[in-house]
Amino acid sequence: MHEQVYCLAISKDGIKWTRPKLGLVEFEGSKDNNIILTEKDPVLGYICHNFSPFLDVNPKVSAEARYKAVGGGPLFPLVSADGIQWKKATEKPIITKGAFDSQNLAFWDSVRSEYRAYHREFRNGRDIMTETSDSFTSSWTKPVFLEYTPDRGGELYTNQIMPYERAPHIFIGFPTRYEDRGLTPSTRHLPQWKYRQKRRALSLREGTDVTEGHFMSS
């Protein structure tokens, strides 16, 4: 396996995608690729595993910080003018409570005029926490777990939460539900069982777990 990398793909319609040749990062002897960041980067390499950029629609956003993200573990604020060249906005982490080796995302809430972030933490299994800030680079509130009606319905891994474009006062989410019952009589009937056995040799749960997409709103 090669090191983790973060790549850029471009689309005009969200259906057909292209991989621009950026010439930024050497990979297997060539810079003829669409990589913007690799985990070997001495400054930002640690964010490759959990990096989820967003376009900041805050009307007061500066040109050099049009794109933002939270990444690392604990989470640091990152900014970019073009979504390609990134830098840390501060040397101090902004969110420290959580399990950050998964999707960590943030966005500008135009209705409440604040930034909101979502990340994973454990509460009877994997769950989702949220916090807010009016500045992005500091003053984040204490994270709290989401509340569900009627209930969570199992462990939730990634969250994919965002404002609904046509009604930004409504948030929608597409979380990944995670389930692992271990090795049972039915496990061998899961898809790609031979491949799962190979993964299980390195990580037991990766040979037996299953996931599915959910939809939720608030």
Give the role of each language-model region:
Residues 1-157, 163-218:
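Beta-rich carbohydrate-recognition and catalytic domains
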